[in-house]
């Protein structure tokens, strides 16, 4: 038995399911999850000392690569001054100014401690500002585990086949309207049925929790127009896409101006952090300047702020955005070429530093319905073949994968060599 398997057995005795977040349990791919001992650059190292080229990146935050010296040094320096004060610090201002500079729609910003907290708070603010109760989300999109958002959700909820969670009262769920991602007609129908009751639309501008689904042309623009027509707010959930799709997030990439934006992952450089922000008149509606209450003991944590500022400072150095996108494109195209070589039906989506692949006969994958038609068993087999070759992909067919600035030619070549062996095995098994 590997040390990871031994630790997993031990963990299940004291931690529900043996993990502190469901998708880590490998339920979507089988076997025991890797228990990680350390990480550096493009690599993670499991409890048995085996190295893996990592395309999970702590589910997105590690865009510079693991254990980057600038982030590590910033964390050490900040920690030496104290871990938490429960009072304002100058670094909170510095960090907020940097984020606002990169994402101009965020005229004012409130720091929180997680992406879930950011989306939950943004929705509360939207409801308070508009004096409306209902919200629109999209099937297969995941915005954290707040009660009102666990309705036809993606990510780990989708992996486990439980997109609607027990424990969410019907009275909460009834205010959440679910539409079809990349289908504006379903949104128009929702507003036609509830014209003055919908506070906001919340959407992942690139859906990363049902794998990787970019918006079709006109979709985000259509959402903006519909919100304007009906007096609702548009919230872009950029917890995953923020600074990964482009320096200005998906909203910069697609030239869409939301009313509110939520961030997480990358802005903490690996530390727990989230943020929400937007139009000043809306943000002024939150306490202490307005009536909508939101608070957090560790919000704006000085160590997390230092880590995030260091991460964004390096990330936005000239040439890094283009290099990350090019690396990801080369990798995605390589996967597709190899799949074609071995007659394995595969569709690939890629935007900036995120990508996803789908074992399907379909040429394009643009919706939750498309994703659910993919060959999950073939994905499981491919994942485990790649893992055996030292390549760690997202352990679920419903999760996006991520590259980092630490992924170079060596890592891409090794990954594609492993992929060729895996596709060859899949082809052989299909013809057996």
UniProtKB/Swiss-Prot annotation:
UniProt GO BP: protoporphyrinogen IX biosynthetic process
**Cofactor or coenzyme needed:** pyridoxal 5'-phosphate
CDD domains on file: OAT_like (cd00610)
Q: Does the keyword Cytoplasm apply?
A: yes
Q: Catalyzes what?
A: (S)-4-amino-5-oxopentanoate = 5-aminolevulinate
Note the PROSITE patterns from the entry.
Answer: AA_TRANSFER_CLASS_3
Keywords of this entry: Cytoplasm, Isomerase, Porphyrin biosynthesis, Pyridoxal phosphate
A GO cellular component annotated for this chain's UniProt record is: cytoplasm
Q: Its pathway?
A: Porphyrin-containing compound metabolism; protoporphyrin-IX biosynthesis; 5-aminolevulinate from L-glutamyl-tRNA(Glu): step 2/2
Listed InterPro entries: 4pyrrol_synth_GluAld_NH2Trfase, Aminotrans_3, Aminotrans_3_PPA_site, PyrdxlP-dep_Trfase, PyrdxlP-dep_Trfase_major, PyrdxlP-dep_Trfase_small
Q: Which Pfam families match?
A: Aminotran_3
Q: Which residues carry this modification: N6-(pyridoxal phosphate)lysine?
A: 265
- Predominant subcellular localization, coarse grouping: cytoplasm
Molecular function in Gene Ontology: glutamate-1-semialdehyde 2,1-aminomutase activity; pyridoxal phosphate binding; transaminase activity
The keyword Signal is assigned to this record? no
Enzyme Commission numbers on file: 5.4.3.8
The record's subcellular location field reads: Cytoplasm
HAMAP family, per the entry: HemL_aminotrans_3 (MF_00375)
Tell me which PANTHER family the record gives: GLUTAMATE-1-SEMIALDEHYDE 2,1-AMINOMUTASE, GLUTAMATE-1-SEMIALDEHYDE 2,1-AMINOMUTASE 1, CHLOROPLASTIC-RELATED
Of which family is this protein a member?
Answer: Belongs to the class-III pyridoxal-phosphate-dependent aminotransferase family. HemL subfamily.
Q: How does it assemble?
A: Homodimer.
Q: What is the protein's given name?
A: Glutamate-1-semialdehyde 2,1-aminomutase
Which gene is annotated as encoding this protein in its UniProt record?
Answer: hemL
């Amino acid at each position: 038995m590997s040390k990871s398997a031994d630790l997993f057995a031990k963990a299940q005795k004291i931690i529900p399911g043996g993990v502190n977040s469901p998708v880590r349990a490998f339920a979507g791919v089988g076997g025991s999850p890797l228990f990680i001992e350390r990480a550096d650059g493009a690599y993670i190292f499991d409890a048995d000392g085996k190295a893996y080229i990592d395309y999970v990146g702590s589910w997105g935050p590690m865009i510079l690569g693991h254990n980057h010296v600038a982030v590590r040094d910033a964390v050490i320096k900040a920690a030496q001054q104290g871990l938490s004060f429960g009072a304002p610090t100058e670094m909170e201002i510095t960090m907020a100014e940097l984020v606002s500079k990169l994402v101009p729609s965020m005229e004012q910003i409130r720091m929180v401690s997680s992406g879930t907290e950011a989306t939950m708070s943004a929705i509360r603010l939207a409801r308070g500002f508009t004096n409306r109760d209902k919200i629109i989300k999209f099937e297969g999109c995941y915005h954290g585990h707040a009660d009102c958002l666990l309705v036809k959700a993606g990510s780990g909820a989708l992996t486990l086949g439980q997109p609607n969670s027990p424990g969410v009262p019907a009275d909460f769920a009834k205010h959440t309207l679910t539409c079809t991602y990349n289908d504006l007609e379903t949104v128009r129908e929702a507003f036609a049925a509830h014209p003055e009751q919908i506070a906001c639309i919340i959407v992942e501008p690139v859906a990363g929790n049902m794998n990787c689904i970019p918006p079709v042309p006109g979709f985000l623009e259509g959402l903006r127009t519909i919100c304007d027509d009906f007096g609702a707010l548009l919230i872009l959930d950029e917890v995953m896409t923020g600074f990964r799709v482009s320096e200005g997030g998906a909203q910069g990439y697609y030239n869409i101006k939301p009313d509110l934006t939520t961030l997480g992952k990358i802005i903490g450089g690996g530390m727990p952090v989230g943020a929400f922000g937007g139009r000043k008149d809306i943000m002024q509606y939150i306490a202490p300047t307005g009536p909508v209450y939101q608070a957090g003991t560790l919000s704006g944590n000085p160590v997390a702020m230092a880590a995030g500022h260091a991460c964004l400072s390096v990330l936005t150095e000239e040439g890094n955005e283009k290099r990350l996108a090019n690396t990801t494109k080369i990798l995605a195209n390589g996967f597709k070429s190899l799949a074609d070589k071995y007659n394995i039906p595969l569709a690939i989506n890629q935007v900036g530093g995120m990508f996803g692949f789908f074992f399907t006969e379909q040429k394009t994958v643009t919706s939750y319905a498309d994703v659910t038609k993919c060959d999950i068993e073939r994905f499981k087999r491919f994942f485990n073949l790649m893992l055996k070759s030292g390549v760690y992909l997202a352990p679920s067919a419903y999760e996006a994968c991520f590259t980092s600035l630490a992924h170079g030619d060596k890592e891409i070549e090794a990954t594609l060599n492993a992929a060729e062996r895996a596709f060859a095995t899949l082809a052989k098994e299909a013809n057996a």
